[in-house]
Amino acid sequence: MKKILSLSLVATAMLLNASETANLEKISVVEIANSVEVTDVSEEQIKSADLADALSKNVPSISIVRRSGIANDIILRGQKKDNINILIDDAKIYGGCPNRMDPATSHVLSNNVQNVKVIEGPYDVENFGTLSGLVKVETKEPTKDVHGEVNLNAGSFGYKKASATTSGGTDKFKLLISASTEESDQYKDGNGDTFYEQQVKKGMKAVPNTMNPMMPATNATYINPNQKAYEKKTVLTKGQYNITDDSEIKASYTANRSDNVLYPTGTMDADYDDSNIYTLGYTVRNLGKLSKELDLDYYYSNVDHPMSTKLRNSGATSYMTAQYKTSMNGQKIKDSFEVANSLVTVGLDTSVRNWKGESFTTNVATGAVTGRTVSLASTDTTNKAAFSKVEKSFGKLDLEVGARYDYTDVDSSDTKKMDRNYDGLNANIFGVYNVDEKMKYFAGVGKSSRVPDARELYSTGMGAQGNSNLEDTKNYEADIGFDKTIGTFKIKPKLFYSELKDYIYNTGTTFQNIDAKIYGLDISGLYALDDHFSFDYGMAYQRGKKDGNYTDKDLAEIPPLKANLALNYEIEKSKYTAEVVAVDRWNEYDSSAKEQELAGYALFNLKYTNQLHKNIGLTLGVDNVFDKVYNSTNTYQDITYASIGSQRVLFNDPGRYGYVNLKYSF
């Protein structure tokens, strides 16, 4: 696999020198063959605002990391955090919390999302840090014609939501405005227990002080047993101005405001999460032989995330706050043009991320703040990169070859910390052989990398301490599969093997580089039984192993076998869906990283939609119909959980959840 770079260069030369006539429109070989697209998210995934929940239901290779009633995280083929890249309208946003309370997926709500495209593997050269996968979130686009909709949603556990969207414009200018507000009480598990009741049952009235065992145990339960689980408000605005038929300017702003988000598995909750995403883009087409399409893009994002113990009994008289802030800005210029019957894309990509954090104590009676300490010194991660991509068709064979060179500086404001710089050349080759319209084979090999983040290098706060000697992680991966249609039956199996060098792993006290491998397969498809009935199916299985002499050789956060099955019945203006999400027993886990065995489970969900009137739509649904008690998420030590003795507290997922959504559109 280490010959990927030279193979990529040879393949590029072959493509540019080939004389066979090709289709010079954008082939998007990787996106066509090696991606999963979840469409109409705002229309279909209306249960709640949680994008992670929607993705885990629709993409077999994605599993949810549930720690709250909202703002949950995802694992893609055994990878999460910085090992996968998440873009929102081509902008990068990172969470502020080192404990993953506010992952990137939490900074956009499903009611604002049009489509999500998931590209598995290292087949992305346009964006910084795509190690093992790319999740591209596309929000709603403005329209010329005047459109709008209002949604009212209610569900179990006191869930209430209202959202509204309007869009319209002219041939020259289009504008979209969307806003939403929602709140929920604590969900109940299959036993009927709320967050607070689970805390009491699991012994969180007396959590030992792991930092100082000589100190008395703390009461980490909620002061108010009926504390709301969260409140959330969002705004999305988008505008497009068409300068000419071949050029336009686009701008957008996304705001997320979340308050008092409860994380019952830990000892702190989020006081608030405030985030903003700004984007500005200019596109011009047909400038001449050297520019089929030229794109100039800029984005800026920022997050303010304070978490504290003030909602817990441990913080009744004085509470601790850990406040983290992060921001990122990026610029990209990309040009596509034709050379030797090939479509060539070249570009420059730069970005700067800042991350910093501090902790302090507040006296409830007086409001006095004391003990301010820096937990993460202000750190800039500056990336500069050049990339290129060539796409070409040779009859039935479509090829895409890409390469990217990165130079990254990581600079800490703490003069006692060692600044780091990293450079890397990454490349991939991906091909699709189209036997006919109903059968295609695809395969790819690639090398990618990602640098350590500020927490992994320099953190002095809670949990594992930073290690400034970390190297960047390299991924050498191969993927192969086929896509076959037989009448109304479609099947798409894929195999992958990923060799990870200098993989960044949390040892409990610090971070270290290890070598490891992840491999697996997934199968997806559908079967249209007739004009009314259809069956969607998908399954994913992956395993992760450490290389070397370790007490436990299993990698952490490698979910077990998972299957998604759905039977749909459509007639006139109605659609009925019965869905099963089944997960095998989690019996291969890293006990040395504080994971534990989890029982398997199968959930049965029902959903009904009806277009009652041309302007009015109704959706009814029940998730976890049989009120199962289950756990979707393991207790890897990269996240701080409350511990009772040697056992980390394991929280149950939601029990039976019913919901109704009424939509008025015009």
What does each model-identified segment do?
Residues M268-L290, Q323-M328, S375-T381, K417-R420, ...:
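Outer-membrane beta-barrel signature, preferentially recognizing the C-terminal barrel domain
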Residues R257-D259, N302-P306, T361, T366-G367, ...:
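Surface-exposed extracellular loop regions of Gram-negative outer-membrane beta-barrel proteins
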Residues K392-L399, T408, K490, L495-E499, ...:
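Gram-negative outer-membrane beta-barrel transporters
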Residues H107-E149, S665:
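A beta-strand signature from Gram-negative outer-membrane beta-barrel systems
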Residues G190-N191, K501, N587, N610-F666:
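C-terminal beta-signal and adjacent terminal beta-strands/loops
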Residues I64, K92-E120:
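Short acidic/polar hinge/loop motifs at secondary-structure boundaries
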Residues K228-K232, D246-L294, S301-T326, T379, ...:
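Flexible loop and strand-edge segments within Gram-negative outer membrane beta-barrel domains
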Residues S156-E183, T194-D259, D274-N286:
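Transmembrane beta-barrel wall of Gram-negative outer-membrane proteins
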